[in-house]
Amino acid sequence: MDSGFGSDFGGTGGGKLDPGAIMEQVKVQIAVANAQELLQRMTDKCFRKCIGKPGGSLDNSEQKCIAMCMDRYMDAWNTVSRAYNSRLQRERANM
């Protein structure tokens, strides 16, 4: 019975795991999880803001509201992300 572990971690076949490959895969998994969380939060917030009465389809004003809400959310997220990364770089430079 195969658990599925090991084969995804860049093993060389000799039972040795490459720490660099494992670290890279973990980084990718974290990035995917972060993107999924961002999308879920954006969807939840924009749905609550824009959809008054859920139905079978979105009317024109709901579509526009969703599009604008998502654009603003992503712009805000990008602004915060850039500021955060800039601060991290400054703090690393001061160490």
From Swiss-Prot:
Q: Where in this protein would one find the motif Twin CX3C motif, according to its record? A: 46-69
- Family annotation (Gene3D superfamilies): Mitochondrial import inner membrane translocase subunit tim13 like domains (1.10.287.810)
Q: Which residues carry this modification: N6-succinyllysine?
A: K53
A Gene Ontology BP annotation from the UniProt entry:
protein insertion into mitochondrial inner membrane
Which cysteines share a disulfide bond? Answer: C46-C69, C50-C65
| Tissue expression pattern | Present at high level in liver and brain, and at lower level in muscle and heart. In CNS sections, it is predominantly present in the soma and the dendritic portion of the Purkinje cells of the cerebellum, but not in the glial cells. Scattered expression also is also detected in the brain stem, olfactory bulb, substantia nigra, hippocampus and striatum (at protein level).
| Record-level Gene Ontology MF annotations | metal ion binding
Q: List the protein's name.
A: Mitochondrial import inner membrane translocase subunit Tim13
Supply the source organism for this entry: Mus musculus
